[in-house]
């Protein structure tokens, strides 16, 4: 019988952002079981479900870009998997996309190189973007862990701007690993000193480096 491997993308938003990685894993495995999806198990004395996840996000950080690979007995189309599993998941954790894997590819944790974060700030009409960017890129603690950052317009009002930041998740050459919680603490301190407010923040996407280009984990499938 032909078996199936699927890579899928899911959310961790609203109150679910306060769940730990292990709680998210348990909820997903329970949803797979309730959906009667015949998941494969590892061999040995203590078999585990063959489902792997991308890097855990810090508790309290919402994400629209969590990824997982799952091995299933029998043939199953990714679109059917998405529809079936979402019937067993809350909207806060629903699967947004899925693709069948036909070729051998690296694991998510071994392959993901960058994560994109969005920070929404209320500038109260102040034009401080260049100052903030200069302060961050001049910081010895964070400059080597950030791949890129830019300010973009927000659809939430003229006083709201979004800081679009891509940080490293693994060492490539001379970079450092981006530590979200440390950066958030620093960014809030910086914002308070300038009397601006950090309204919201979340993980927007994860990327894999392929031939000098940033691809999502589903792009390479």
Please identify what each model-predicted range represents:
Residues 105-123, 207-221:
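Short, low-order "capping/linker" segments at domain edges
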